[in-house]
Amino acid sequence: MKKRLVLLLVTAMAATTVLAGCGSKDSGSSDSGKKSAKESKVENDDDTLIVGFDASFPPYGYKDDSGEYVGFDLDLAQEVCDRNDWKLVKQPIDWDSKDGELNSETIDCIWNGFTMNGREDDYTWSDPYIDNKQVVVVRSDSGIDDFSGLKGKHVEVQTDSSALAALEGDQKDLAATFADLNQVAEYNTAFMDLESGACDAIAMDIGVANYQVNSRKNPDDYKILDKEISSEQYAVGFKKGNTELKDKVQKTLDEMAEDGTVDKIAEKYADYGVPGALCIGKNSK
């Protein structure tokens, strides 16, 4: 009886192992059965591209009125996936956690107005595709017309953003004139603070500034100062060393630039200055 019980237990354990193995293959939820992003894109034609993005960074990635994730970068990613028979997974992330998401391979790349300048050695990069600059937005009735008007003012900036890096780096002398420089999680919050008077100015990307201002009920209530804080370029960031996936995406982007698809997609966001900011095919890294 004891031997029979042992035999039954062994048989049950073996069956459980087989079933678990089958289940993990179908669901893709088991770590042991999960291929790295680098391996899967090379080996499988019908795989997925998981794009990490900040869902409050228009016009590059954001949620529209119908609740769908849209934006210029996501449109580019969708076209890349369509041409490679991949499924696009749009994965919103906390911008502060982007490196952890990428290094753990829960996402395959960061594609969302991602500045490459100063980070060249931290990721494997695509070629740049957007020339960007950091600017300051104020209320039109604020009396602030240039950087000197920011003295003693409350300025907000997104955490871990290029504007923050500039104000803590090359433009630290400018930031020293502010009453304070407060960090917020996303720019929707910053604009609500600007509307209410909780802050006097916002330092941010020009594309996002154009979108936020033009989408307000009264866009004339805001203005963008003429002088820029800094300039930079956007590129797609992959995990360091993932050159195989980067090369495949880059090849497809180059084809899209050559046949006019990138320009066509950019025209959808003409109100936010995207066509004029394109540099893909014009610059080489």
Positions of predicted regions on the chain:
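Short helix-initiation/N-cap motifs at beta->coil->alpha
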Residues: L74-D75, V89-G100, L181-S196, E232
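Acidic, polar ligand-binding/catalytic clefts
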Residues: Q78, K87-G149
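C-terminal motif of bacterial Sec signal peptides marking the signal peptidase cleavage site
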Residues: T17-G21
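Ligand-binding clefts/hinges and TM-proximal coupling segments of bilobed small-molecule sensing domains
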Residues: S24-D31, S36-S40, K87, S162-N182, ...
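A ligand-binding cleft/hinge motif common to bilobed small-molecule-binding domains
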Residues: S97-G100, G113-D122, A166-G169, E195-S196, ...
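Extended ligand-binding regions for polar small-molecule ligands
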Residues: G23-K25, L74-R83, S148-G149, K153-H154, ...
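Periplasmic-binding protein-like
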Residues: A55, D131-V138, I206, N214-K251, ...
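Bilobed "Venus flytrap"/periplasmic-binding protein-like clamshell domains
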Residues: A55-P58, Y69-D82, F114, V135-N188, ...
